[in-house]
Amino acid sequence: MRVGITLACSECKQRNYMTTRDKKKQNEKIEKKKYCRFCNTHTLHKEIK
């Protein structure tokens, strides 16, 4: 079952990206390095509820 998640910037805490993931196959939280328009740089984005 795929569920929607939000990715937030680890530096400024802005919620920049929405994506989905499969809860059965992936138990750990997602962390991706993506562009943050508020920080104006690439930062680590972590999954939040």
UniProtKB/Swiss-Prot annotation:
Entry protein name: Large ribosomal subunit protein bL33
Family: Belongs to the bacterial ribosomal protein bL33 family.
Any GO MF annotation of the entry: structural constituent of ribosome
Disulfide bonds: none
Membrane-crossing residue ranges in chain numbering: none
Keyword entries, A-Z: Ribonucleoprotein, Ribosomal protein
HAMAP family assigned to the protein according to its UniProt record, in alphabetical order: Ribosomal_bL33 (MF_00294)
Annotated InterPro entries: Ribosomal_bL33, Ribosomal_bL33_sf, Ribosomal_zn-bd
Pfam families per record: Ribosomal_L33
Gene Ontology BP term (one): translation
One Gene Ontology cellular component: ribosome
